[in-house]
Structure formats: C-alpha cells, structure tokens
Amino acid sequence: MQRILFILTVAVLSLSAGEAYAQRDLPGQTGIQFTSGGVNHFLSWKSGGERHYFTSLAFTHTNRNRTYWLYGLDYQIKEYTYENKAIPKAQFTGELGYFIPVLSDKGRNVCFRIGLSALGGFETVNWGTSLLPDGAAVTNGGSFIYGGGLTAAFDVYLTDRIIFLLQVKERALFGTDAGNFHTQVGLGVRFIIN
C-alpha cells in the first residue's frame, strides 16, 4: 500500500514540477482540452430516448496578453422522435476561436473568459438514410454548415498544468435544416503540454 501511495505522489508531483506558483497563461503555452455536455435541453438522455449531447477536442495556444487561440473539432447530436423512433441529426464542425480573460483572481486560480469562434462543417440527418421503416421519407439530407459561436468559460486551475472547464456556448449555424441556434453547456479538462 505504501508503494502505491509513493508512486501516486511521485506522479502528481511530476505533473506540476518545473514551474513556480502562478505560472499560468504564459505566452506560448499549448494545451489540449476535452469538453462534453448537453445541447439545448441540457440532459444527455430525455425520457423518450432522445439524446442531445456534444463532445469536442481542441488545442489552445496562449498569446502574450493572456488571450488564447482555440483550434478544435466538435461532434454534436440531437435526436428527434418520430413514431417512437429516434431520428438523429449529427453535426461535425471545426472551430477557430479567440478567447479573452474578463475577470480572474490575483493568483489566476479562477478565470472567466469570453470567446468568439468561427465554425464550419457538415450536418447529416438520419445518417444519410432517407427512408424510414414505415415508408416515410426524410427530406433533409446532408449539408454543409457554417456560422459562429459565442462562449462564456470558467477556467479553474487544479494545478499549473491541469485546468477544469465549465463552458456555455451559443452556436449560430446556417445551412442547417433543423434550427440555427443551439446552446451547449459542458464540462471539460485542459492539460498544458509544454
């Protein structure tokens, strides 16, 4: 048991080694982040079996003024019920965003940021299958989508290299057949990799 505790202690200390206190938002820092959460209804699964969720993977690069660029990929799915069958509408988007710090404490343990993003990608309805089991036809097919997003994000530093994220993003996408505006609420984690 003592050996396991020793190994865990060494592993945790090695993650935060090499930097002094509050070495956060330094120019040139690069991070990788994973975020997941709910879309519009903020529940992953509704009682009717519908799923409304998103997941994203992104890289960040910090600038001199504590702002950062975000380069990400996003997968969002919303299901609509028809005759007790869930019809999925999936969106695959790329994101290029710019985030600025609005408010933070003195040690930069907690930071509130606002971000603006450009989005572009592809949307598919019912995975490209236009005929339903009862013979009904889905008239919406796949389409290219484009637009932007406005994000409010809380970054909570667990260590200098591990950041807990809480984000609310409003996406405005055009070229879609099922609603232009979608709100995402998600939790995530970012690891500073350099």
Regions found by a protein language model. Name each.
Residues V138, I145-V156:
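Acidic, glycine-rich flexible loop segments
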Residues G28-T30, G49-T55, A86-G94, V110, ...:
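Residues that define the transmembrane beta-barrel architecture of outer-membrane proteins
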